[in-house]
Amino acid sequence: MVQLNQDFINSIAKDMPAHLTMDDFISYSSKPLRPSIRINTLKISSDEFVTLMAAKGWTLDPIPWCSDGFWVALDNEIQLGNTIEHIQGLFYIQEASSMLPPTALFDGLDNSSEYTILDMASAPGSKTTQMASLMDNKGLLVANEYSSSRVKVLHANVQRMGVYNTALTHFDARVFGEYLYHQFDAILLDAPCSGEGTIRKDPLALRNWSLEENASIIETQKALIESAFLALKTGGSLVYSTCALSRSENQEVCEHLMSCFPQAVEFQSLSELFPDADKSCTSEGFLHVWPQIYDSEGFFIAKVRKVADVERQKPLPKAQRNFPFTAANNKTKDELSHYFKHTFGISLPKDGLIMERDLEYWLFPAKMADFIGKMRFQRIGLKLADGLKKGFKVRHEAIMALSDKHNAIELNESQAIEYLMGRDIPLQDGGKPQGEVILTYHHCALGVAKHLGKRLKNNLPRELVRDKVISAKAKTEL
């Protein structure tokens, strides 16, 4: 049984609802989490994926608050992160409770594909990619992460999942209320917290828990929610969430926001967000998810609507200069579009901006035009290709995000594993060399190869070559 910090037990007992018991809390906290995944509908439908994986011995049990989320029961032990399907971005390994904040934010958000949305604390990217999927890669999703090392992880997951409506930033999120005041239609603040709800995933999560340590976290949470509210447009929605369980990191932070802007804050009830949501709903309409309620991690979710204008707290910052990208001219855009269509059968999205930097060609979200000069961005949109003396060289991430099920060579499982391990694929009766071709598995993109007639020359970027790739239906390593 998990060893819980006694100070934590004493503290949390005061916050536990009367209808729940500490014995049940400790019992569920001692159980391993049920594995759960979210299907990436930017690449494959949930129905297609369920059918596909059922044939491989997977049993997928729907998560009631996320239409694309499933608990997974497997016929044998499989390292999900090493499967072909995970590497090619067909699913994200995501704890079930963490799917709740995006679901709450997008509930009632019509035409979300046209919105500008902020994810204030994004890494490693589970909620960012979930929101991008809900937006169908449209609109603009600004994804911020304070930790430089975690920005890299965020970017890797955005790429793997084929997301291209994002602009990544690397700031202390307290600056958003100043730099991007009144800019966002909706905001998710999944705030840094004590992690009290993650004990089932990490038995040592509460080893150093203390009220003193939490006090500084709470001050940060209050500053972040103020910043988020200032960055939100009037009429917009803000979801505040944590994986903490205490009132001090949850309800009291929301009450702090109400005290700061009493005329502008309206709490929205989440009691009908999904069947049985009322089991975790507080009197304010927040969801306070304890592990024993849904057999999940602990989580807290509150939804706030901004019902009145709030004055800017600080002067408008100076515009950022020296933006390194320029809009591509019509000739370049036509040549790039022809290259993608003629070589790969891909039509570039018409609602994006084709931008260039030196000999790099990028696809930016159209709404990015409104943000240039307002803040420094780490990475925007999707890198399409590099320029050559004659023509272009496609980027792997462009194929992973834009390719469809046509104009490709379908690999079998053993060939797909070989490709992801950086090896060339021999061909029998390969015919004449065809140049650059898209490779697929399950008719979803794996990457690009050069068809040389008798073999497919592997063009997988070196940093993406894997030492270990496994079948989703067996533990056999090839």
From Swiss-Prot:
Q: What is its EC number?
A: 2.1.1.178
> Carries keyword Hydrolase?
no
What is the protein's major site of localization? cytoplasm
Catalysed reactions listed for this entry: cytidine(1407) in 16S rRNA + S-adenosyl-L-methionine = 5-methylcytidine(1407) in 16S rRNA + S-adenosyl-L-homocysteine + H(+)
Asked if RNA-binding is a keyword of the record, the answer is yes
Read off the InterPro entries from this record. Answer: Methyltr_RsmF_N, MeTrfase_RsmB-F_NOP2_cat, MeTrfase_RsmB-F_NOP2_dom, Nol1_Nop2_Fmu_2, Nop2p, RCMT, rRNA_ssu_MeTfrase_F, RsmB/NOL1/NOP2-like_CS
Q: Where in the cell is it found?
A: Cytoplasm
Q: Active site annotated at which positions? A: 243
Q: What does this protein do?
A: Specifically methylates the cytosine at position 1407 (m5C1407) of 16S rRNA.
Record protein name field: Ribosomal RNA small subunit methyltransferase F
Source organism: Shewanella woodyi (strain ATCC 51908 / MS32)
